[in-house]
């Protein structure tokens, strides 16, 4: 009889723990959906390099968020395409571009990252660069 009571108690505890884990909501976050994002093209004009990408960002927050984006391209510095490995998404006037993310949804953007040209018109690869997302307060 004791074994039966212990077994039921353990079973109850295990089921309770599983139910509490299942009901936990995922942490709010903003991240790039790499399966829906890709490098598109690059272009050199005068002393600037324009890296074009299609970026899909997931916003799991309950409210709208505004973010800025930057790309990290160390191979393109080594190759001689870029002077700096971190380049930002900029507007035509040169100011940093802000992206508004709707709550609890995927948001897709065509993004142009702009960096300083280092002299060699050769891209290291055509992979999506590492993307940094910064929430604007």
Where are these regions (language model features)?
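Bacterial N-terminal signal peptides that target proteins for export
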Residues: 2-10
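C-terminal motif of bacterial Sec signal peptides marking the signal peptidase cleavage site
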Residues: 19-23
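Low-complexity, acidic Ser/Thr/Pro/Gly-rich terminal tails and inter-domain linkers that flank the onset
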Residues: 24-49, 76
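Short, solvent-exposed beta-strand/turn "edge" segments of beta-rich domains on protein surfaces
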Residues: 39-50, 58-64, 99-103, 120-124
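Hydrophobic beta-strand positions in extracellular immunoglobulin-like domains
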Residues: 55-57, 113
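Short acidic, flexible loop segments centered on an aromatic residue
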Residues: 62-84
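Intrinsically disordered, low-complexity Pro/Gly/Ser/Thr-rich segments with frequent PxxP/GP/PP motifs
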Residues: 84-119
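Terminal connector regions
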Residues: 108-137
């Amino acid at each position: 009889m004791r074994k039966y009571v212990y077994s039921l108690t353990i079973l109850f505890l295990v089921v309770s723990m599983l139910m509490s884990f299942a009901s936990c909501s995922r942490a709010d976050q903003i991240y790039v959906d790499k399966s829906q994002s890709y490098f598109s093209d690059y272009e050199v004009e005068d002393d600037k390099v324009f890296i074009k990408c299609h970026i899909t960002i997931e916003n799991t927050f309950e409210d709208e968020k505004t973010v800025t984006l930057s790309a990290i391209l160390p191979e393109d510095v080594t190759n001689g395409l870029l002077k700096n490995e971190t380049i930002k998404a900029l507007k035509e006037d040169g100011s940093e571009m802000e992206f508004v993310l709707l709550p609890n949804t995927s948001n897709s953007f065509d993004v142009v990252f702009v960096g300083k040209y280092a002299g060699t018109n050769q891209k290291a690869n055509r992979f999506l660069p590492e993307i940094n997302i910064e929430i604007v307060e």
